[in-house]
Amino acid sequence: MSAFNTTLPSLDYDDDTLREHLQGADIPTLLLTVAHLTGDLQILKPNWKPSIAMGVARSGMDLETEAQVREFCLQRLIDFRDSGQPAPGRPTSDQLHILGTWLMGPVIEPYLPLIAEEAVTAEEDLRAPRWHKDHVASGRDFKVVIIGAGESGMIAALRFKQAGVPFVIYEKGNDVGGTWRENTYPGCRVDINSFWYSFSFARGIWDDCFAPAPQVFAYMQAVAREHGLYEHIRFNTEVSDAHWDESTQRWQLLYRDSEGQTQVDSNVVVFAVGQLNRPMIPAIPGIETFKGPMFHSAQWDHDVDWSGKRVGVIGTGASATQFIPQLAQTAAELKVFARTTNWLLPTPDLHEKISDSCKWLLAHVPHYSLWYRVAMAMPQSVGFLEDVMVDVGYPPTELAVSARNDRLRQDISAWMEPQFADRPDLREVLIPDSPVGGKRIVRDNGTWISTLKRDNVSMIRQPIEVITPKGICCVDGTEHEFDLIVYGTGFHASKFLMPINVTGRDGVALHDVWKGDDARAYLGMTVPQFPNMFCMYGPNTGLVVYSTVIQFSEMTASYIVDAVRLLLEGGHQSMEVKTPVFESYNQRVDEGNALRAWGFSKVNSWYKNSKGRVTQNFPFTAVEFWQRTHSVEPTDYQLG
């Protein structure tokens, strides 16, 4: 990522240049762009309608028809250029309806108000607060503390800055970026297309379809610089305690930095500490006896050279499927220990670069970047939630939870099966015995299975009994000797806000309320007995089959900033979610999760806590979360 698209370009290029670069255009994006620029929505012919498969819009045309469409669009762009017309603004609601239903059909209609916030020009930010502290409570002393400067902390900070609310961020690391600063393992990259895994107000120019971690980290740094966030951040500062002081109606926070411990107070505290940042290393007997290097993928030791070494990897989650192919290229021997396996989501462009022509179109054709993002946002916002819904009359099993789920299973299996043609033994190992969506689906372009087919790679499904000084011993008595062991075993995802000690009214400890790993919150944000406390990316806000964490973070930040508006505008000191509201919401979430593949299946996954309750996932649609978080309902809260 080298810059931002921040201005609307002019189409000041000759015919040959346009023709050359249109050869690299995405057909659905090109048609949407030309229809918007010219105002002629009739060009969106039914026979040019794209196909939607697994959350992606593709042209679905043969090469001859694609060539005809490119030539047609070229002539329309030439006419637009020669007419001297200025580019229109963002699409109207009527235009968005026509363009959206052409792309997606009627399924998109409920989502259009949400999509409208994504369908903006590069200069616009429709989610910015429409109020300012100077206008609602100019003389009031008021401060917000945000804990964490990852993507969610950054968007919360920007919204408070836009609203004129004083704030400070305490970040335990030495820079912004959160997980993208911390995770440096080989092969680390996003599993959402780069243009969709980005803020709605900061349209980046990316080098890869699915950006490697260094690009995402650079993007986060660029956003922080562009919006003046660095000056509000205290780095290398770790908050250890947060206590609600009833007498002052403020939070008392204790943090440690290079100068020791300091106590500060704030009216509101926002926890933006993430979920996937505390590595989980299983308690395997003998773990301390291994004589070689041993580390978790999130704490990669770059001083260790695995070339020519015998390497053992425990776990096959999303991170492991990224770093294992890197290790396999030069390791002498690589053995992968896996309890369960993942369904793979076919993603041909997973490791592809953005073409020069695509970059040119994004930079030089008005609104092409808008529609390039929206053509992803529409199918991704809908996702395939319906494909993982349990149909109790089907009936659901560990193979499939509905007819739609079974079709998805068959589609993915049809993509995987040919890769096993020369290794039928791997089929028995790699085809999951759980429904699609039962655990996290992993993107792949064929690399994963081809890696496991290498002569120097093998997968071990025998349970591990003990780690020895020489390696790993399984329950069948086989000892596998290694020079290096890497854990790809995920994180303590269910232990929200750990290890920070948080106490609310009457000294109630939050982690006691949550019983360690059974976190619950209203809208994933707020909890009774903990006034003026909000979480970003909190309990049951995880997304696994649609949308992105960044889109949900933007929604969450909008809600939290609106809550602060309510406090300031009404002259209130505190707001605390009512217990019946909290309980009703969480009951519905639990019931919803029970009727999703991840709640029905018995397969082990990080979506669930130690008791089997789903603490991670939001089981409903993206548009429902948007509707619930668009503004605060005052009657949900006890205001004091």
Swiss-Prot record:
Changing K439 to A/F: 100-fold decrease in catalytic efficiency with NADPH. 4-fold higher efficiency with NADH. Changing K439N: 20-fold decrease in catalytic efficiency with NADPH. 6-fold higher efficiency with NADH. Binds 1 FAD per subunit. Inhibited by amino-NADP(+). The keyword Ribonucleoprotein does not apply. It comes from the Bacteria. The record marks R440 as: Transition state stabilizer. Its EC number is 1.14.13.84. Catalyzes a Baeyer-Villiger oxidation reaction, i.e. the insertion of an oxygen atom into a carbon-carbon bond adjacent to a carbonyl, which converts ketones to esters. Can oxidize a wide range of acetophenone derivatives. Highest activity occurs with compounds bearing an electron-donating substituent at the para position of the aromatic ring, e.g. 4-hydroxyacetophenone and 4-aminoacetophenone, leading to the formation of 4-hydroxyphenyl acetate and 4-aminophenyl acetate, respectively. Is also able to oxidize sulfides. It holds the Pfam family FMO-like. It is an enzyme of class 1 (oxidoreductase). Keywords: FAD, Flavoprotein, Monooxygenase, NADP, Oxidoreductase. Homodimer. GO terms for molecular function: 4-hydroxyacetophenone monooxygenase activity; flavin adenine dinucleotide binding; N,N-dimethylaniline monooxygenase activity; NADP binding. Changing G490A: Retains activity, but shows impaired binding properties of NADPH. Its cofactor is FAD. PANTHER family: FAD_NAD(P)-BINDING DOMAIN-CONTAINING PROTEIN-RELATED, L-ORNITHINE N(5)-MONOOXYGENASE-RELATED. The keyword Zinc does not apply. This is 4-hydroxyacetophenone monooxygenase. It catalyses: 4'-hydroxyacetophenone + NADPH + O2 + H(+) = 4-acetoxyphenol + NADP(+) + H2O. Belongs to the FAD-binding monooxygenase family. InterPro entries: FAD-bind_Monooxygenase_sf, FAD/NAD-bd_sf, Flavin_mOase-like. Optimum pH is 7.5. Optimum temperature is 30 degrees Celsius. FAD binds at S152, E171, W180, D191, I192, Y197, V239, Q275.
